[in-house]
Curated annotation (Swiss-Prot):
Molecular function terms from GO: inorganic diphosphate phosphatase activity; magnesium ion binding
Taxon lineage: Eukaryota, Viridiplantae, Streptophyta, Embryophyta, Tracheophyta
Cellular location(s): Cytoplasm
Protein name per the record: Soluble inorganic pyrophosphatase 1
One GO process term, biological-process aspect: phosphate-containing compound metabolic process
Enzyme class: hydrolase
Activity control note: Inhibited by Zn(2+), Ca(2+), Ba(2+), Fe(2+), Co(2+), Cu(2+), Eu(2+), Eu(3+) and Mn(2+).
Length: 212
């Protein structure tokens, strides 16, 4: 059999049928899920909630949510030698005054890939001013990590852990000549109130959008 005949036979073979779910995903009517708007915050919110991880523990890469596409994009590489001390992300279906979802630093044993989501418990609030603007961070623990799931308040953490977190945020923009101020950590009640407020703000935003 000649090579030309073999090539013709290969061309005449019927293409394998694609899985219907793949075909559905390629449909013009299908829309990819958006991690901010489509992922549930979780039935235990504001105490226990889902977190979408943007930045991996130990990373120098500053990833962030691209609000238009819902993808995780590279914002920049940190200018200093510091790395993120813990996994960092946001709570879905929340909104803050800066028009972003509320930020969360999740304390746990292992780094988590950007784009994954996990369950977390709020244990404290870190009030922060970034270049003159409010940019508070929720401090949380992963409720599915056996080493940290028992923590319920930030005062239970070792003082060194809090110093580590504070120093990172105070220093990570210094080489960009940007000023960040971190105030005293607040207890879990303050964190829960901040999350509830951001949930309410998001709900108001959705209602306002639907009424347009």
């Amino acid at each position: 059999m000649s090579e030309e005949t073999k090539d013709n036979q290969r061309l005449q073979r019927p293409a394998p049928r694609l899985n219907e779910r793949i075909l559905s995903s390629l449909s013009r009517r299908s829309v990819a899920a958006h991690p901010w708007h489509d992922l549930e915050i979780g039935p235990g919110a504001p105490q226990i909630f889902n977190v979408v991880v943007e930045i991996t523990k130990g990373s120098k890469v500053k990833y962030e949510l691209d609000k238009k596409t819902g993808l995780i994009k590279v914002d920049r590489i940190l200018y200093s030698s510091v790395v993120y001390p813990h996994n960092y992300g946001f709570v879905p279906r929340t909104l803050c005054e800066d028009n972003d979802p509320i930020d969360v630093l999740v304390i746990m044993q292992e780094p988590v890939l950007p784009g994954c989501f996990l369950r977390a418990r709020a244990i404290g609030l870190m009030p922060m001013i970034d270049q003159g603007e409010k940019d508070d961070k929720i401090i949380a623990v992963c409720v599915d990590d056996p080493e940290y799931k028992h923590y319920t308040d930030i005062k239970e953490l070792p003082p060194h852990r809090l110093s580590e977190i504070r120093r990172f945020f105070e220093d990570y923009k210094k080489n960009e000549n940007k000023e960040v101020a971190v105030n005293d950590f607040l207890p879990s009640e303050s964190a829960v109130e901040a999350i509830q407020y951001s949930m309410d703000l998001y709900a108001e935003y959705i209602l306002h959008t639907l009424r347009r």
